[in-house]
Amino acid sequence: VLQKAEGDLFGKIYEYFLNKFAMTGAQEGGEFFTPMSLVQTIVNVIEPDHGIVFDPACGSAGMFVQTGYFIESEGLKPAEKVTFYGQEKAELNTKLAKMNLTVHGLEGKIFEGNTFYEDKHNLVGSADFVMANPPFNVDGVDKAKDVEKKDTRVILDGKEKKKKNDN
């Protein structure tokens, strides 16, 4: 059967097992992957069809895979239209993201690192699309290491801008 597989069959199989992993193993560690229906909604609303697409909490790269499907549905090739950049805190998820892109025939620059503390891609002001479902359940954020302290977008004349945090 696998010798006669066509199209994105391996990608679909990988997504199936990734979803099973997300529903069991990942949640035990307090990590949750964004539901596919939400990912599809985000992609359909912002229509990321060109340039740099960045996900600062990319998990298993589901946003990128759905973006690839979106671009292909327009009759275009994702590799010719977009460049994916992702950052993921957990080492295992970083590996899952890279593998997910590979089995779907996509390429991207995925780095391991905590976005709260460091911007591995240095894309401030450069990304055409930023898609994320940030990890609201993050524990132990070290304020002293927070990248925000060095981010010129939130510092004004040596004083931090007052921010409103009303999710």
Predicted regions and their residues:
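Short, mixed-charge, low-aromatic patches
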Residues: V1-L2, G125-F129, K163
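Short acidic-aromatic active-site loops that bind/stabilize oxyanions
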Residues: Q3-G7, E28-M36, K159-D166
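N-terminal functional modules and adjacent low-complexity/disordered segments of proteins
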Residues: Y16, E91, K150-D151
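Mobile active-site "lid"/loop adjacent to the S-adenosyl-L-methionine
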Residues: G75, F136-N167
